[in-house]
Amino acid sequence: SATGLYSRATGRNAEAAGTASFATGYGVVADQDNSMSIGQFNALQTEGALFIVGNGADANMRSNAFEVHSSGNAVIHGDAVVEGTVFAGPYDVASTLGSLVSTVDSLQTVIAELQTQLEALTGGE
């Protein structure tokens, strides 16, 4: 049912309660103003959410798979599988992480060598 002003609801037991909200799916509720909820049995009262994909089991076990908030943050509840390159600004995340791990490994080797030299100079004390 669509109880919010300028709202629409489609599907089975879907409810659009927020102003200018839209809900479609099974047991979904769009309870935030200017929001859209799809899927099934999304979590209720998700503050600041504009877009929600619900993946709950039933009305007593509500949960979200994905959320986009008015702050610009996106929240994935579960693993994110990426087929392609992930960039953070201009940086290829996987390449940068690999480079950092390699640098840390090199530094650990240097530290171990320096520790050995220090022990030799101090007589192991």
Q: Which residue ranges define each predicted feature?
A:
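Periodic small-residue-enriched repeat registers in elongated scaffold domains
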Residues: 1-83
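Positively charged, low-complexity intrinsically disordered regions
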Residues: 9, 13, 109, 116-118
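Intrinsic low-complexity, repeat-rich intrinsically disordered segments enriched
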Residues: 42, 73-106, 110-113
